[in-house]
Amino acid sequence: AFGDALDAARAAGENVSVVALTRLAVSYEIMPERDIQKIIALARAAGAKIIVDDAGGARVGPAIFDQPKSLEFDVDIASTGLDKYGTIGPRLGLLAGDADLVADIRATGFELGVEARPMLYPAVVHSLAQYKPQRVRDLVATTKQVAEVMKARFGNRVSETPVTAQLKGEDILEMAMERAGI
């Protein structure tokens, strides 16, 4: 699908200069490593820079799915957040990769007023230092235990991915309406 979209963009005369991908979707579905590698290869062939938005996937991918770490992929930039699986905050994003690109992005961040304040740096170091892949595995195992309890109570309304369980908004609304007799 991505290759078709890339081909269509090039056929339309568009210059594809950047390709961004997300390893772990907001829905908590993981992109398979083979798909990531295929996208990277196609993007490289097109001469595009590659950014991986790895907010939650930076830790879930390696710890749960035995995928490479973000920068072990052939990408130019990787980003993640410290408020996701296995880290303890603060709530901010990290950017790593090609030093020149990171410097350019950081300068733009300063211009826009969205850079991390230096007073947060010690908390960033602490969060990264305490990180262990086992913590992610433990969090996922606990989530699966909670999912079993939820399924016993809510049945097939519980939706599961390999790393999370959830009740969808429409199911919560339906249950509330049932309880209200509506």
Regions found by a protein language model. Name each.
Residues 1-136, 146-155:
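Conserved PLP-enzyme active-site core in the AAT-like
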Residues 158-182:
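Conserved C-terminal alpha-helix-loop-beta "cap" of PLP-dependent enzymes
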